[in-house]
Amino acid sequence: MYDDLYAELGDGDLRLVKLAETHREALRAVCAADADIWPIYSSSFDPEHFDKSFDTLIGGAGRMPYGIFDGDRLVGMTAWLRPDPSAQSIEIGNSFIHPDVRGTGFNGRLKKLMIDHAFAVGIRRIEFRIDERNKRSQAAVAKLGCTKEGTLRSERITWTGHVRDTALWSLLADEWVGRR
């Protein structure tokens, strides 16, 4: 199931390509376009911290990262995280898109592509773990039909030292089928 999950995906001009070393410099430029956003992320992809975070993302166990492309242009990143074969679950996270494509429906298309694929290969549950302060991302997953299950209090310490409360959102396969 998880071998089939981490596949390159596409829908017209939207493509998810397995993130690789060859994407480093293009992604560095994309992430630098919104340096103010990184304090609400667990790790920073700002210019000062980019290389360490990129190395962790592409080399980390339990992480299946993608470069997000709009045509031939790299516009962001996302990943499958926390695969749990016994629960047939996965998290979608580490998502960032360039400010130019926010508010255009691109992120909704991206998430729907990932969700459709995950459920097609046998995943039963998809989670989104979002910093409570990140209202934009919470609104986006609510719009997809996800359910907020609660808040994991003091769940992690971010790169800034902030003790983060994490909103836990989920979507089940049978819920998605009913919405599609």
Task: Please place each PLM-identified region on the residue numbering.
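Acetyl-CoA-dependent GNAT
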Residues: 48-89, 93, 99-100
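Conserved active-site alpha-helix within GNAT-family acetyltransferase domains
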Residues: 134-150
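Glycine-rich acetyl-CoA-binding "A-motif" of GNAT/NAT acetyltransferases
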Residues: 73-76, 136, 163
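Active-site acidic-Proline motif in GNAT/NAT acetyltransferases
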Residues: 98-104, 133
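A short, well-structured alpha-helix characteristic of acyl/acetyltransferase catalytic modules
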Residues: 1-52, 175-180
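Conserved catalytic-core motifs of GNAT/GCN5-like acyltransferases
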Residues: 129, 147-164
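Conserved acetyl-CoA-binding loop-helix of GNAT-fold acetyltransferases
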Residues: 103-117, 139, 143
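Conserved GNAT acetyl-CoA-binding A-motif
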Residues: 120-130
